[in-house]
């Protein structure tokens, strides 16, 4: 009986820990979002106002305008991964 209880405990404890990890991971999921570039003219002069954003290409951009400019120049689908530095 004690051996059976021990085996059940060894089986359940790792599962409980895994559930907690999944909940923490799910709570911190980051989904990319599209930058608002439609209003921009061809190759605009971007303001130098620092408002750092992290692109899905892994690069940090000074602001959304700079990310849009890179999208236009490279024709790549770079999105905003998160606000702030990568």
Swiss-Prot record:
GO biological process terms held by the UniProt record: response to xenobiotic stimulus
Q: Which Pfam families does the UniProt record give?
A: Kazal_1
Please name every pair of cysteines joined by a disulfide bond in this record: 37-68, 46-65, 54-86
Q: Where in the cell is it found?
A: Secreted
SMART domains per the record?
KAZAL (SM00280)
Record carries keyword Secreted:
yes
List the keywords (alphabetical): Disulfide bond, Protease inhibitor, Secreted, Serine protease inhibitor, Signal
Q: Mind telling me which GO cellular component terms the entry cites? A: extracellular region
Molecular functions (GO terms): serine-type endopeptidase inhibitor activity
Q: Does the keyword Disulfide bond apply?
A: yes
Tissue and organ distribution: Expressed in the intestinal tract.
SUPFAM superfamilies hit by this protein: Kazal-type serine protease inhibitors
What residue range is the signal peptide? 1-26
Q: Where's the Kazal-like domain?
A: 31-86
Could you say which residues are annotated as the site Reactive bond? 48-49
Major place of residence: secreted
Q: What is this protein called?
A: Serine protease inhibitor Kazal-type 4
Species per Swiss-Prot/TrEMBL record: Mus musculus
């Amino acid at each position: 009986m004690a051996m059976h209880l021990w085996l059940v405990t060894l089986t359940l404890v790792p599962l409980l820990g895994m559930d907690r990890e999944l909940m923490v991971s799910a709570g911190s999921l980051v989904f990319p979002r599209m930058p608002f570039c439609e209003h921009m003219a061809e190759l605009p002069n971007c303001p130098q106002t620092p408002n750092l954003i992290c692109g899905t290409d892994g690069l940090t951009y000074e602001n959304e305008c700079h990310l849009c400019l890179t999208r236009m120049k490279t024709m790549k689908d770079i999105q905003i991964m998160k606000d702030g530095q990568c």
